[in-house]
Regions:
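Cell wall/extracellular polymer interaction/catalysis modules
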Residues: 65
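Short S/T/G/P-rich N-terminal loop/turn motif that feeds into the first structured element of a domain
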Residues: 1-61, 71-87
Length: 87
């Protein structure tokens, strides 16, 4: 398994909710979590768990949704992780 954490300095909106709804249908995506900071509503995080690094790379290289997110949320960053253990 492979994971990445997407972080943006942006509050939740109808647009971000729609992005997440579209994202959940991505092939190869096993789990996705949308988080918002309790103390800072602009602290937005999405955690994506993929079946493989290749599945995540396919999404990152070719998805129109990724381009839409990057344009709408210019502060977005993605950090990549290998999943070592899970429950």
């Amino acid at each position: 398994m492979f994971a990445y954490i997407l972080r943006a300095n942006q509050s939740r909106s109808d647009e971000t909710d729609e992005f997440f709804r579209r994202f959940k249908d991505t092939p190869g995506l096993l789990h996705a979590y949308s988080l918002q900071g309790e103390d800072d509503l602009n602290d937005s995080v999405a955690i994506a768990i993929w079946e493989s690094r290749e599945a995540a790379e396919r999404y990152l290289q070719s998805s129109p949704l990724k381009r839409d997110v990057d344009q709408a949320m210019p502060t977005v960053t993605r950090t990549f992780y290998s999943v070592l253990d899970s429950k």
